[in-house]
């Protein structure tokens, strides 16, 4: 009996846990490698993922793998550590459909990039530099080495602590550069300094890419909240990189990669809305109508709870920030911003517009590093009933006076006309 109760408890707990993770990134991950020896040189990276519960399936780039079957995707995440392979079993169009399905992609490059990887990057708004080029910096490089292509990089993304969570340790980077397009969906996670430039690795001839426009690590968060991250260095994820040092101090490479990958695979920065409350607190009309029926110019209270997923704690916690609320019927009649409290509740009182129709109450959050939140609720707003208007409207007093003066004048004229007799001439 005891074993039965333990089994039932385990099943219920598993169901609850799966329901939580159903709202965030899944764990089925395909890892495509140029060479299976990368499993050894990058063992710490893969081990950290497995410790988090990710189910990794390793395949060589020339192995036939199907991402989608009968409309269902076989994986939730895709790791492409095959920058030079021209023999991928799936095309850039397949990867694009994978992203359109809401799945996540992490891929890395080297100083030689295959056309498949270039096409995938181009679809995601990233233009990779020519083959056999590297990013150089004659001022910000590892002084323990004579190689000026080993950068000491600390130009992290601003205004988005959710991606790197305030990481301030510099990292070592050696790889190819890229440029991101002017697109609000693209994030420059790590860029070169103002003295960095891209050049041929052998001849040293520089290209047009230079300064802070040199992308080292960039991401795309699609409109369906799928996340794609590209690193110009495959070595960034290696064991050697994780334990590298800068001026005899530990570098931030390992911490940088862990935070970057956890964000890419949707362990953080995922928002959800719940507990909507839209109630009437006062009315402009004189009649007593049902409380769930809204009429024009009613005073209403709007309340919405917003939470974000904490991958470390494995649960939803309140999101404290700002939220944009719009009341729309073709055009927005009301647009305002609401600050959340410590419990993640966003509340506001406002008066409905003096226009009737079916209105959309749209709450949205569009913030770098967080998933896009669009909560939509539709509600009809009715005009006043015939018995809801005031008996006399002050603005119409001049018209009332005109009507009554006309009536009185007509009455007086009628009396005079009826009872006044003209004197006959004799």
Swiss-Prot record:
Its main location: endoplasmic reticulum. GO terms for biological process: protein N-linked glycosylation via asparagine. It is found in: Endoplasmic reticulum membrane. It comes from the Eukaryota. Pfam families: OST48_MD (PF23358), OST48_N (PF03345). Residues 23-398 are lumenal. The chain crosses the membrane at residues 399-419. Residues 1-22 form the signal peptide. One of its GO terms (cellular component) is oligosaccharyltransferase complex. Glycans are attached at residue 286. Disulfide bonds: none annotated. InterPro entries: DDOST_48_kDa_subunit (IPR005013), OST48_MD (IPR055459), OST48_N (IPR055457). Keywords: Endoplasmic reticulum, Glycoprotein, Membrane, Signal, Transmembrane, Transmembrane helix. Residues 420-426 are cytoplasmic. It is a single-pass type I membrane protein. Pathway: Protein modification; protein glycosylation. The keyword Transmembrane helix applies. Component of the oligosaccharyltransferase (OST) complex. PANTHER family: DOLICHYL-DIPHOSPHOOLIGOSACCHARIDE--PROTEIN GLYCOSYLTRANSFERASE 48 KDA SUBUNIT (PTHR10830:SF0). Belongs to the DDOST 48 kDa subunit family. Subunit of the oligosaccharyl transferase (OST) complex that catalyzes the initial transfer of a defined glycan (Glc(3)Man(9)GlcNAc(2) in eukaryotes) from the lipid carrier dolichol-pyrophosphate to an asparagine residue within an Asn-X-Ser/Thr consensus motif in nascent polypeptide chains, the first step in protein N-glycosylation. N-glycosylation occurs cotranslationally and the complex associates with the Sec61 complex at the channel-forming translocon complex that mediates protein translocation across the endoplasmic reticulum (ER). All subunits are required for a maximal enzyme activity. This is Dolichyl-diphosphooligosaccharide--protein glycosyltransferase 48 kDa subunit. It comes from Dictyostelium discoideum.
């Amino acid at each position: 009996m005891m074993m039965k109760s333990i089994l039932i408890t385990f099943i219920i707990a598993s169901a609850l846990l799966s329901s939580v993770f159903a709202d965030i990134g899944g764990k089925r991950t395909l890892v495509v490698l140029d060479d299976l020896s990368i499993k050894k040189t990058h063992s710490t990276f893969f081990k950290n993922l497995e410790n988090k519960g990710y189910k990794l399936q390793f395949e060589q780039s020339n192995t036939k793998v199907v991402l989608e079957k009968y409309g269902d995707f076989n994986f939730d995440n895709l790791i492409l550590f095959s920058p030079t392979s021209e023999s991928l079993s799936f095309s850039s169009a397949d990867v694009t459909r994978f992203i359109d399905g809401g799945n996540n992609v992490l891929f890395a490059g080297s100083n030689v990039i295959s056309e498949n990887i270039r096409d995938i990057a181009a679809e995601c708004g990233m233009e990779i530099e020519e083959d056999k080029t590297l990013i150089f910096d004659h001022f910000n490089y590892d002084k323990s080495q004579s190689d000026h292509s080993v950068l000491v990089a600390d130009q992290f993304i601003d205004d988005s602590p959710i991606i790197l969570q305030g990481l301030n340790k510099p990292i070592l980077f050696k790889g190819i550069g890229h440029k991101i397009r002017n697109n609000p969906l693209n994030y420059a996670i790590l860029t070169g300094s103002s003295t960095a430039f891209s050049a041929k690795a052998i001849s040293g001839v520089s290209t047009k890419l230079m300064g802070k426009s040199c992308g080292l690590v960039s991401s795309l968060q699609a409109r369906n909240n799928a996340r794609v991250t590209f690193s110009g260095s495959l070595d960034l994820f290696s064991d050697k990189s994780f334990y590298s040092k800068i001026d005899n101090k530990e570098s931030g490479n390992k911490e940088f990669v862990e935070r970057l990958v956890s964000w890419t695979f949707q362990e953080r920065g995922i928002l959800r809305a719940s507990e909507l409350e839209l109630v009437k607190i006062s009315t402009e009309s004189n009649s007593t109508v049902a409380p769930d029926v809204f009429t024009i110019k009613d005073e209403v209270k709007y309340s919405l709870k917003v939470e974000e997923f904490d991958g470390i704690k494995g649960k939803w916690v309140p999101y404290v920030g700002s939220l944009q609320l719009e009341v729309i019927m073709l055009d927005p009649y009301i647009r305002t911003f609401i600050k959340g409290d410590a419990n993640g509740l966003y509340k506001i009182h406002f008066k409905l517009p003096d226009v009737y129709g079916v209105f959309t109450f749209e709450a949205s959050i569009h913030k770098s590093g967080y998933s896009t939140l669009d909560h939509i609720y539709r509600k009809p707003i009715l005009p006043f009933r015939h018995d809801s208007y005031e008996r006399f409207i002050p603005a119409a007093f001049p018209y009332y006076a005109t009507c009554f003066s006309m009536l009185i004048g007509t009455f007086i004229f009628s009396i005079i006309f009826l009872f006044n007799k003209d004197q006959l001439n004799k």
